[in-house]
Amino acid sequence: MSRLRWLTAGESHGPALVATLEGLPAGVPITTEMVADHLARRRLGYGRGARMKFERDEVTFLGGVRHGLTMGSPVAVMVGNTEWPKWEQVMAADPVDPEVLAGLARNAPLTRPRPGHADLAGMQKYGFDEARPILERASARETAARVALGAVARSYLKETAGVEIVSHVVELASAKAPHGVYPTPADVERLDADPVRCLDADASKAMVAEIDQAHKDGDTLGGVVEVLAYGVPVGLGSHVHWDRKLDARLAGALMGIQAIKGVEIGDGFELARVPGSRAHDEIVGTPDGIRRVSGRSGGTEGGLTTGELLRVRAAMKPIATVPRALKTVDVATGEAAQAHHQRSDVSAVPAAGIVAEAMVALVLADAVAEKFGGDSVTETRRNVRSYLDNLDIR
């Protein structure tokens, strides 16, 4: 059963995003600066659109934190939208004079749904005659709220169990980084300084070249990010039920990120292409205890963490707002048309890695809280240490 609960609210061009996280113990260190640092990382990446140049994330804690520490009550955080004054009437919660709205270009009905977005299916489901009410919430801007909560979860994981999380881009379009080269937490600063957050210099150059070409072609690109969690204790999750398996929870969380269309744990789909003798991680005795000689499983077996490096990948499709504009139908007229286009990224794969880090952090934080409990960080930390010290099989 989940110990933590989280929820976000807000629209892309609304006054703010808000998020709540319930179930954390007292004593987790967190400040607005810590959250702002991760939100700034979310704006990184070569190929981002103009919005990243002027978008600023104003972080305010509304509850659950006092003097830099959680209090054991629900944590509420707000990420303000500095562009709100431009949208105050278009996105107002209260009714606005129709004559005022009619004179606003930003309020023009969006009746040409974009292929690859939630536009058309959302309009059909909720009965809207234009896409604005759908795209405002479906926008990847919402991930800023999840990154904010992820910052809190990361602090909890590090303080209680010593878990640290890092991500990198392993594929962007046809450019690929060498397989099996895994960054550590010590590489984060170097990764964030790279234009595409890739550890391999040659692969990074190839990825930048792919983005440049796509920009010239009026196109967009997807890719694959890999998230690694170091220090994850053995035994998180469960083999008992499908919804308690940790890899299932990780996959669901990552698939919930906008534009993610595939997830694999460890070597994932590659394991389907090799015989069993080459697919599994053999177990050996070492001076440090019983270990696995490889990491093909990605640190989970049977829905449980193994104590080895946790490794997951997420595949992001190309951004659906394509500059060259794809074919669609204008729902107001029924005529063939080109899809609505606004400023967009050529690629947001590097940023997807930061969002994926946050989601992995939230899932692992939930699993740690579920396994070890505790009303304070001190109590949880003590429970973790006691568990690890008293494992019957090491």
UniProtKB/Swiss-Prot annotation:
| Enzyme nomenclature, EC number | 4.2.3.5
Please share the entry's free-text remark on the cofactor: Reduced FMN (FMNH(2)).
Has UniProt tagged this entry with the keyword Zinc?
no
**Which residues are NADP(+)-binding?**
R42, R48
Q: Which Pfam families match?
A: Chorismate_synt
Specify the pathway: Metabolic intermediate biosynthesis; chorismate biosynthesis; chorismate from D-erythrose 4-phosphate and phosphoenolpyruvate: step 7/7
In terms of InterPro entries, this protein maps to: Chorismate_synth, Chorismate_synth_AroC_sf, Chorismate_synthase_CS
The domain of life is Bacteria
The chemistry this enzyme catalyses reads: 5-O-(1-carboxyvinyl)-3-phosphoshikimate = chorismate + phosphate
Q: Which UniProt keywords apply?
A: Amino-acid biosynthesis, Aromatic amino acid biosynthesis, FAD, Flavoprotein, FMN, Lyase, NADP
Q: List, alphabetically, the GO terms of the cellular component aspect.
A: cytosol
Cofactor(s) recorded for this entry are:
FMNH2
Q: Which family would the database say this protein is a member of?
A: Belongs to the chorismate synthase family.
Q: How does it assemble?
A: Homotetramer.
Purpose: This reaction introduces a second double bond into the aromatic ring system.
Protein name, as recorded: Chorismate synthase
Q: What organism does the UniProt record list as the source?
A: Streptomyces coelicolor (strain ATCC BAA-471 / A3(2) / M145)
